[in-house]
Amino acid sequence: MKNHKGLSLGLLSFAVLAFGLLVPGRPFAQDQIQRAKIFQDTYELISDTDLYCSFYMHEEGKPLPDLRIIGADRMNEKEGFIEQDVIYLSKGQADGIEIGQIFQIIGLEDKVPPYGTVTQRRGRARVIRLEKKVAVAKIERSCWAARVGDYLLPFEEGQGEIGKDKGYDVMDPNASKTGQVVYVDQDYRTTGSGRWASINMGRQQCVQIGDQVTVFHRARPNLPREAVGSMIVIDVRGATSTVKILACRDAIEAGDEVQLNTTR
């Protein structure tokens, strides 16, 4: 009997609480409901990790930076350098390097003919000491281990994006520009949600950061294409772009077709 009475009181309390949350004129409750609805529709499409830890295609014929890592404090102990490690740069005070300057560390990876070389953003380093021809820097953020011979570029702040995944569906092949996936993250044959890939569409095709792309797969060249995923552009070069896979129902691989999503 006591258990039955306790259960009844518990149900009554729950009903009162639910009524209090839904009753008109309670802005806090309505605000929470509205917030929940918003978060179902929008989220962080481009994150700091996408901006500073992804890769891009260094295109054939483009010059490489002339600032490089020439050594490290612990280079006799290990080959890869991460956060808090001290590295030595190929230029110094006489070359205009200043204390406090921040550089992005990049490293060359796989060649992807005819587009260029996959270039990985390894992290960033800050100059802490100067000599005439050498700068001393400390790695502040590490995405991937930096190595002797890696290049450095002046660090530039990127801008993330909050928005809604437009999804993927059947599209008219003539509705917008099309291309192909030419490289998938870390040289896997296939890749999935949250990973990065390169496509052969860039500034030459008027592609911009934040554009969303639908990816299609064909079981055979003579069969209809099927939409398998959605992607967002996170970096744009002349003839290529880096994209992040937002969602997919099947593995995405090099050679899959892509098309700009014009859905509003």
Task: Name each region found by the language model.
Residues 1-2, 29:
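Intrinsically disordered, low-complexity peptide-like regions
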Residues 2-14:
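Bacterial N-terminal signal peptides that target proteins for export
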Residues 17-27:
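C-terminal segment of classical bacterial N-terminal signal peptides
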Residues 25-264:
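Surface-exposed, polar/charged interaction patches used for macromolecular assembly or partner binding
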